[in-house]
Regions:
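NTP-dependent small-molecule kinase module
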Residues: 23, 149-228
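Hydrophobic positions on the alpha1 helix immediately C-terminal to the Walker A/P-loop
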Residues: 18
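Extreme N-terminal, non-catalytic leader segments
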Residues: 1-3
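Conserved lysine of the Walker
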Residues: 15
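ATP-dependent small-molecule kinase phosphotransfer cores
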Residues: 29-133, 208
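A glycine- and Lys/Arg-enriched "phosphate-lid" helix/loop adjacent to the NTP-binding pocket
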Residues: 102-182
Length: 228
């Protein structure tokens, strides 16, 4: 089997950039490596996800049950695995994923306030994707930890450049995003993810973004010992 490394984090945390840099570095080192990104919007399997995020099943994130929403995302990952990277992975290749089941965990668990319901959901999701669907379990998860206030500022800048609303019911709900950001802490502890800080406070107690290179080096150091 191969190696599966996940880059996780909220919007604006730089997952795509860090995925690209890690793939480039590992390729230069002679590793067989490919990248994937979820949801895979180029696949027909992602159509229900597009409808969900566009609010066609309900304008509020709580309108769709976490188990139903999770099923949509699981099918998308299953289709990607079976058609795009299963053979490469099973032959020992390294897969760098921009989001994975990990995103489903955080975005859906926050729909529950009760800790027992959250734990039951996470247990179910692990069994559903990694056993029922047979998807690979990650070897490492790097959480690109971006302070929410910085992330929202970056998202506002990005939205301004692209001309308005992203059409994503998740991104449009501030209270939901706060809950997601806070819930990452629970997942870091439960699954022993690698936390990679994307911003640090300066002497004026203001957040300052770390450089892309600094973040990349932290990601690399977190996974280098896993490489074949």
């Amino acid at each position: 089997m191969g190696t599966l490394i996940i880059l996780e984090g909220g919007d604006g945390s730089g997952k795509a950039t860090q995925t690209k840099l890690l793939v480039e570095r590992l390729t230069k080192e002679g590793h067989a490596v490919e990248s994937v990104s979820f949801p895979n919007y180029d696949s027909g399997a992602a159509m229900p996800i597009k409808m969900y995020l566009a609010g066609e099943f309900g304008k509020d994130v709580h309108d769709v049950n976490p188990y139903v929403a999770s099923s949509m995302y699981a099918i998308d990952r299953f289709a990607s695995f079976r058609t795009d990277w299963e053979e490469f992975y099973k032959n020992g290749g390294i897969i760098i994923a921009d989001r994975y089941t990990t995103s489903n965990m955080v975005h859906q668990m926050v729909k529950y306030d009760d800790q027992k319901e959250r734990t039951a959901f996470l247990d179910w999701l692990e069994d559903f994707e990694f056993k029922k669907f047979g998807l690979p379990t990650p070897d490492a998860v790097c959480l690109l930890d971006m302070p929410l206030e910085v992330s929202e500022a970056l998202m506002a800048e990005r939205t301004g450049k692209t001309g308005g609303n992203t059409g994503d019911i998740h991104e449009g709900n501030h209270q939901y995003l706060v809950a997601v950001h806070d819930a990452y802490e629970e997942l870091v502890e439960r699954y022993q993810w690698h936390r990679i800080p994307c911003a640090i406070k300066d002497k004026a107690n203001q957040y300052a973004l770390r450089t892309i290179e600094e973040i990349h080096n932290d990601v690399y150091q977190a996974v280098v010992n896993l490489l074949p």
